[in-house]
Amino acid sequence: MKKSLLVEGDGGPLSMVVAAANVPDATLLEATLDAVVLERPPAEPPDWTQHLSLDAGFDDDPSYLAALDRDYTPHIASHRTPPPPPERRFPARRWVVERTLAWLHRWRGILIRWERKAANYLGLLQFACALLWFRRLHRLTNGSPQSYVR
């Protein structure tokens, strides 16, 4: 089973898609970008674009075109060219997605899939994403993340 997750810069989940393990990454990327639950803010200034960081598994033309079709500037780690020297590399951004997946995997029902139907599992994932947003909102408005009972 594959889980495809789109997060904002601080790790807040924006969309989640589950699929069989044999689904190509480009197809899953298109579904993930189309499943965003919030409208994107208008570009200010007009030439401003949103960036999409992807790992080397998405280094193909369909993934690149899927990002461009949805007005993202893709940043895809490349298999095609050698990596630049360390002083010219951009900072890593993929860890934000990995951290959000680690937050989601704290729940046993998500780490190990017990549900037979994919729709039930997706609902559980979406509920967990909503809890992540609730915890974040609670922390931002009340201060301490430990001030409520788990």
Residue ranges and their predicted role:
Residues N22, P41-A118:
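Helix-centered, glycine/charged polyanion-binding patches within enzymatic domains
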Residues L5-L6, G11, L29, D55, ...:
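Mobile genetic element proteins and their domesticated derivatives, centered on retroelements
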Residues V17-P42:
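Active-site beta-loop-alpha junctions of metal-dependent nucleic acid enzymes
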